[in-house]
């Protein structure tokens, strides 16, 4: 019995020693692993090779929209403010702005969008060739002047002699209550130089009004649009000349068709390319001499014709 008890204690002691050895060995191995890993982490930190995952990475990632894949990638802008459009987008802009321009021609946003959606590349390339083939046109493309009330110095123009282009222009602005600062920048034409050519056309529009004396009432706008279309071939003025009269009164259409359309056809075809006129450098020129040099005849005064028409109506009603 005594020997059995001694043997049992001996076995228990051996087992306890074995467990202690195993625990010690495991602790040593685990500690060595941790120490080795810490050494590796420290080494990586020292070499700049350690990178932790950013928990906010998913929030900082740029959202990828369906339109940004290889089939619908948006082109890069070609100049400040440029908005590249797909063909279908430009077509939808044409439809929307066309309807808006017909029913609400007083909304300038419709006119602007219609103009740029119909400013097709072949027409703009033709104007570009005209400018490149002319020394003044080349100078305009090289210098790229912009027309604002500051660049034109309207106060200086008011002080010029009455027979000058500058005084005629600023007098027309004052009479009609408009400003050269209202011309919005081109956004939807893809080529930078073509965009400038259309911007130039847009900013010169008031000079066409000034040298012809036509007001900004709808009949005057249509007449100037016909002149622009016949001279430069830009589509939007042609569409305006074709469709805008449909909303006019019979008396207005009669004036346009009998007086101002024939004048605009004749002047537009006979005049020199208006896109090549450096208006800013002609401000001190005699306006009548300028008209002759350009080949533009001045049409009958539209406001006077309207006054005469309404006076006649008033007289007939009294009778």
Swiss-Prot record:
Zn(2+) binds at residues 205-206, 209, 221. It is found in: Mitochondrion inner membrane. The keyword Lyase applies. The keyword GTP-binding does not apply. InterPro entries: Coq4, Coq4_euk. Pfam families: Coq4. It catalyses: a 4-hydroxy-3-methoxy-5-(all-trans-polyprenyl)benzoate + H(+) = a 2-methoxy-6-(all-trans-polyprenyl)phenol + CO2. Keywords: Lyase, Membrane, Metal-binding, Mitochondrion, Mitochondrion inner membrane, Transit peptide, Ubiquinone biosynthesis, Zinc. Its cofactor is Zn(2+). Its EC number is 4.1.1.130. One of its GO terms (cellular component) is extrinsic component of mitochondrial inner membrane. GO terms for biological process: ubiquinone biosynthetic process. Component of a multi-subunit COQ enzyme complex, composed of at least COQ3, COQ4, COQ5, COQ6, COQ7 and COQ9. Belongs to the COQ4 family. This is Ubiquinone biosynthesis protein COQ4, mitochondrial.
């Amino acid at each position: 019995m005594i020997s059995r008890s001694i043997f049992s204690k001996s076995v228990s002691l051996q087992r306890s020693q074995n467990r202690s050895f195993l625990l010690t060995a495991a602790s040593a191995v685990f500690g060595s692993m941790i120490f080795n890993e810490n050494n590796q982490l420290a080494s990586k930190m020292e070499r700049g090779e350690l990178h932790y995952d950013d928990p906010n990475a998913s929030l900082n990632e740029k959202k990828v929209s369906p339109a940004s894949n290889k089939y619908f990638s948006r082109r890069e802008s070609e100049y400040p403010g440029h908005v590249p459009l797909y063909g279908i987008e430009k077509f939808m802009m044409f439809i929307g702005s066309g309807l808006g321009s017909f029913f609400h021609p007083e909304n300038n946003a419709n006119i602007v969008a219609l103009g740029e959606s119909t400013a097709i590349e072949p027409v703009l390339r033709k104007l570009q060739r005209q400018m490149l083939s002319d020394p003044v046109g080349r100078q305009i493309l090289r210098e790229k002047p912009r027309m604002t009330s500051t660049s034109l110095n309207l106060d200086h123009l008011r002080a010029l002699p009455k027979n000058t282009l500058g005084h005629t222009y600023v007098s027309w602005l004052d009479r009609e209550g408009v400003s050269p600062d209202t011309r919005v920048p081109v956004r939807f034409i893809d080529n930078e130089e073509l965009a400038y050519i259309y911007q130039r056309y847009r900013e010169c529009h008031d000079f066409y009004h000034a040298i012809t004396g036509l007001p900004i009432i709808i009949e005057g706008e249509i007449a100037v649009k016909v002149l622009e279309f016949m001279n430069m071939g830009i589509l939007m003025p042609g569409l305006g000349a074709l469709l805008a009269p449909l909303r006019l009164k019979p008396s207005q259409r009669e004036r346009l068709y009998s007086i101002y359309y024939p004048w605009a056809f004749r002047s537009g075809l006979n005049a020199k390319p208006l896109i090549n006129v450096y208006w800013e450098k002609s401000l001190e020129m005699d306006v009548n001499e300028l008209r002759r040099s350009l080949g533009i005849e001045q049409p009958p005064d539209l406001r006077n014709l309207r006054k005469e028409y309404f006076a006649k109506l008033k007289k007939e009603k009294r009778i």
